[in-house]
A protein has these predicted regions:
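N-terminal Rossmann-like NAD(P) cofactor-binding module of classical short-chain dehydrogenase/reductase
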Residues: 1
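Class I S-adenosyl-L-methionine
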Residues: 6-160
Length: 160
């Protein structure tokens, strides 16, 4: 599995791309290369792989994703009384929020079955709490949803 930094790739940060391009003309190409390294290693060793990134320019710099998901689609893998262990004041119980995320995968990676939970219509209201540049905010925005992580583990583990 690979989780390349989305800072230079995610379209949610497009307002900052021009400023970043002035500092480093190749910043997005270099960011996309980190994904390609993970892909090349998986290909070299013939192992299943999964690369996760939000909706981003990676789709045009490399290739289209193999799948997409929203966290709430896998919230059913978490207990009914679930609260996030570190950020329960921000992340909804059972990952009950939308955030389209892209997955590039191959070499036998098994896509997990969805187990959706109810979610409010529209945009995630936790986005209101996740603006800014603090380290905590950046960490929270970059976390892989726990329900999806568990679903991937169960789908791809031969020991379960």
């Amino acid at each position: 599995m690979a989780f390349p930094p989305c800072t230079d790739l995610a379209v949610s940060g497009a307002a900052h791309f021009e400023r970043k391009r002035l500092a480093n003309q190749n910043f997005q190409i270099e960011a996309a290369e980190t994904c390609k390294v993970a892909f090349k290693l998986a290909e070299k060793y013939g192992v299943p792989y999964m690369i996760e990134n939000p909706v981003s320019v990676l789709s045009s710099l490399w290739r289209k994703p193999d799948n997409t998901f929203h966290p709430y689609e896998y919230g059913g893998y978490l207990p009914e009384d679930d609260l996030h262990p570190f950020f329960s004041d921000i992340i909804k119980p059972r990952d009950a929020y939308p955030k389209k995320t892209c997955i590039w995968s191959g070499n036998g990676f098994k896509w997990p079955h969805a187990s959706p939970v109810d979610v409010n219509d529209g945009y995630s209201d936790q986005n209101k709490k996740l603006g800014g540049k603090s380290k905590k905010t950046k960490v929270i925005r970059s976390l892989t949803p726990r329900g999806f992580a568990r679903a991937v583990f169960l789908a791809n583990s031969t020991n379960c």
